[in-house]
């Protein structure tokens, strides 16, 4: 099966994100996947009215743009399967393979955050689209494209949540239709990133108690990583430190025990 990996990022991007992109390119070569990188042409197929309504909410525009590009590539027979990975996804275990058994799959994350108004942490499981893969003739792909546009037409432009057309929609649908999930492609919250960059603690312990298999790639969640520190330079340093730690886990990451090397 011919597989193509699709990514996109702004021309001006931080060095830590460039490391993520490089990890995906290297992994794609190891897995013998084709690789395509898009710049501003990512939004080529997105209707003008949709972009206008998104305004500055680029993640919402990207949620539709990636699907339209994947649909186009599949129509052109560029591949039998097209995989999208967000620019802030780090692949640190080279043996990761993404091959949907059904016609599509999405990622799954265990998101650790502080309890509101309480001490300690809580963890929530969510479907995410930092990874998405579709095969030829997938009926879900055109359905999602249609649903997202219908939702946008009805939405109040002043109240469009960043995850409205991505994780929130997919998690809601998953509860009904049970998507195939790639749990090996997870996500790390700011609380997890902080402990990866410094010392494992309660957040990592809670995360580890919930995971069902080793994480082989992680969405570093650029939109929330700014919570790591007040200064951009400190945020960048923490992300580089976390990336260094994850890259040392070539067999996968399941928690603090993965960080103890013989």
Map each language-model feature to its residues.
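Conserved beta-strand scaffold positions in the cores of enzyme catalytic domains, especially
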Residues: 35-37, 82, 181-184
């Amino acid at each position: 099966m011919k597989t193509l990996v699709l990514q996109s990022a702004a021309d001006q991007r931080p060095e830590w994100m460039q490391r993520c992109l490089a990890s995906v390119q290297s992994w794609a070569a190891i897995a013998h996947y084709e690789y395509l990188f898009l710049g501003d042409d990512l939004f080529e197929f997105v209707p003008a009215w949709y972009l206008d309504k998104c305004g500055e909410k680029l993640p919402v525009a990207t949620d539709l743009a990636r699907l339209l590009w994947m649909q186009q590539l599949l129509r052109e027979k560029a591949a039998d399967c097209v995989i999208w990975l967000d620019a802030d996804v780090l692949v640190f275990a080279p043996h990761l393979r993404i091959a949907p058994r059904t016609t599509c799959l999405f990622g799954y994350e265990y998101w650790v955050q502080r309890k509101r108004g309480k001490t300690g942490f809580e963890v929530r499981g969510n479907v995410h689209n930092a990874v998405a893969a579709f095969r030829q003739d997938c009926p879900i792909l055109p359905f999602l494209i249609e649903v997202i546009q219908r939702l946008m037409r009805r939405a109040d432009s002043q109240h469009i949540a960043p995850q409205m057309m991505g994780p929130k929609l997919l998690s809601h649908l998953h509860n009904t239709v049970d998507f195939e999930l790639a749990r090996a492609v997870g996500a790390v919250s700011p609380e997890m990133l902080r402990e990866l960059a410094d010392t494992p603690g309660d957040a990592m312990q809670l995360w580890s108690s919930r995971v069902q298999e080793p994480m082989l790639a992680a969405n570093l969640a650029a939109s929330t990583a700014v919570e790591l520190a007040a200064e951009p330079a400190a945020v960048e340093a923490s992300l580089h430190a976390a990336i260094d730690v994850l890259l040392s886990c070539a067999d996968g990451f399941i928690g603090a025990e993965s960080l103890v090397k013989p």
